[in-house]
Amino acid sequence: MTTSSFDNGTGNRNEPTLATDQTQPAQPLQSSHDTPAPRAAEASVSDASTPTPGGGRVPSWVRAVVRVIGSRDYVGVLIAIVALALVIGIAHPAFLRFSQLTDVLNQATFVAILACGMAMLLAMRELDLSVGSIYALTSVCAAILMKHGMNSWVAALIGIGVGAALGLTNGLIVQLFRLPSIVATLATLSIFRGLAYAISNGQQLLGPSLSDSFSVFAGGHFLGIPNTVYVMVALVAVLTGVLYYTPFGYRIRSIGSNPEAAAFSGIPVVRIRLLAFVLMGTLGGLGGVLSLGYFGAGDPNLGIGYELLAVAAAVIGGTSLMGGKATIVGAALGSILLAVVAAGLAYFSVPINWNSFATGAVILLAVILDSLLRRRRTNNSPRL
């Protein structure tokens, strides 16, 4: 879909689309002079439950929650979300209703899933511009399988597997031919989108019926909140743990900080790079099959521009384009900011021709605010 749409309380399932791209300043390089990288990673994981002065141990998940909540990397985007929501709510009080706020969260979910994977790639100085096409192709593939009588859950799992295979394809192209990922995935963007059009004949394909259990799950609610939001929250929690509390996440950040030093220290750079692309493709597949269950159709036009949305959300949330740093929570918050912008444009009846301009301007302001706040913290931090 090439135009932005937002549900103003009608209950219709509409797909949001915005597009932008931003940049962030480079982050300081990480260093590991005394401990080889793999051992340092293992140490960071094993230290997650260190003894406290009282003799007890702090569970690793508690330390993870404290670390995420205590982080200030994404305070700028959080302030922007609250400020924009208040501005819209003052002018249009209906926006602050619980049903509308949960709808904004749901609108953000599909981009947030992609943005989480994009943050992992950006952390190691890579990029996947084909993720929007993967999103569409996997939804079409799953819809075809369901159309031929396959169980919807099995078809959804196969669709996610297709996404993983497409991500692996991207990684192999980048690695085997030594191509910059932006060039390789720019090509596969067109290839995967073309496949989606070819196998669907350019038409929407009906997915599971509304009574199907997969459709009920993808389009259902629990405690008034869409199930897709719970999926996004769970994904953010898992990937945050992976990024900060596993050797895999440590190696991603190490490669992004200094690829040569990472390779010299024994990190399997090629394997980690391939796994990161597979993860990105898997998340593209997850988003695609969830959209199939939610919207009720596989559409080759789905996800157009989502690659730029995912990059923008990740960067707005605090992930560095220069590598070495990523925040999964920030990527999700960046997606929510984009959804709030889309809602504001709809509520203020901004002409469609001005949507891209207004969206880009708001995103730029959010990035500048976030950058200024982080620069101020850096200047105020003690020098060693």
Residues covered by each model-derived region:
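Loop-to-transmembrane alpha-helix initiation sites
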Residues: 107, 152, 181, 225-232, ...
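Transmembrane alpha-helical segments in multi-pass inner-membrane proteins
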Residues: 284, 294-359
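Hydrophobic core segments of alpha-helical transmembrane domains in multi-pass membrane transport
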Residues: 77-89, 118, 193, 231-242, ...
